Amino acid sequence: MNREFVEAMQHLALERGVSVEEILEAFKEALRKAYIKRQKGYKKEEIDQGKGPEVDVYIDPNSGRIEMVEVRRVVEKVEDPDKEIALAEALQYDPEVQVGDEMEFPINPEELSRMAIQDLRQILTQRLKESERNRIYNEYKDKEGQVLTGVVTRVDNRGNVFVELGRGEAYLPRSEQIPTEKYHPGQRIKVYLKKVDKSAKGPSLLVSRAHEKLLEHLLKQEVPEIAEGIVEIKAIAREPGRRSKVAVTSHNPNVDPIGACIGHKGQRIQAVSAELGREKVDIILWSKDPKEFIRNALSPAQVGSIELDPEAKKARVKVTKDQHSLAIGTGGQNVRLASKLTGYDIHFEEAEISDLDEALRRAAEEEAEARERKAREEFEKLFRDLG
């Protein structure tokens, strides 16, 4: 090897956008594998498993001179002829050698270089992929769980979408997409970074448009009261692209959490809906009373009495015939979302209108009692703070 070799390595490094050191390391690996494969007869899979002799390669980055040696450990009895040499044989090379020493046997690199160059491109490509995967992992690991803005680069024939996120390409599989949306190259979209995977052979950044956290982020972005902690999101249930229910509460008695989320003339909630493919977003008042929370979650339907089985997390709800279909919703959507939001498996029983009137009266009384209890707790807290 000579200076021309060094210049060729420099040119290849420039072409691939990597350092000369990385090119030289890749070439060393190619030389090692060429020797073990061509001279020792090992297959690629065996070499990758660490089989074969130990080979050290030295390359002078200035002159391009290459030195190669096969390293063997001196032992009394040889068990691995590729990595060991018997003491009796070793003494023929060095009369002062001892058991446990390592001996180096020179290898002529010239005849291997041509073979190694054939493998260099493949090894270099593999190393570059590993290097790129490590870079993406280190850059994006701390961003896992965040919402990022990216640009769609391509859509494959199975409908999976690839999104450019600055210096990394993310993978948006069909299972994480909003079903009602169509994606096209050049389109800017917001995505939730669900997982950063270093070991993946394919794309290592998994993103989602269907995740509840994306909706939560958009609400924080549009509703200052949420961003400031005045209004708190307690639970979210989504059927992406179609409908969502969001349970909220206010830590300030002067702030209406539902009104804050909806905004003047519905502007805030409409902006969120537009970002999610016109997904309908219902804002629900959260309550620590499970019955009241379930009643609110089933809105816009009006329901009667509610019986709970807290251990089984089941709720039996009475509803009149004219409210039954509204409580269930199209294709069962309303009750599915309410169940997911509250954590209760909700079942309905039809009730007479008179029964419903009585149930609504009791519900109103319970709600009034709950408001009075809450006001009393806030007054007592204020009194303690002043004291």
From Swiss-Prot:
One of its GO terms (molecular function) is RNA binding. Keywords: Cytoplasm, RNA-binding, Transcription, Transcription antitermination, Transcription regulation, Transcription termination. InterPro entries: KH_dom, KH_dom-like_a/b, KH_dom_NusA-like, KH_sf_prok-type, NA-bd_OB-fold, NusA_bac, NusA_N_sf, S1_domain. Transmembrane segments: none annotated. The keyword Cytoplasm applies. Residues 145-209 form the S1 motif domain. One of its GO terms (cellular component) is cytosol. It is found in: Cytoplasm. Its main location: cytoplasm. Residues 312-379 form the KH domain. GO terms for biological process: DNA-templated transcription termination; transcription antitermination. Monomer. Binds directly to the core enzyme of the DNA-dependent RNA polymerase and to nascent RNA. Belongs to the NusA family. Participates in both transcription termination and antitermination. This is Transcription termination/antitermination protein NusA. It comes from Thermus thermophilus (strain ATCC 27634 / DSM 579 / HB8). The lineage of its organism: Bacteria, Thermotogati, Deinococcota, Deinococci, Thermales.
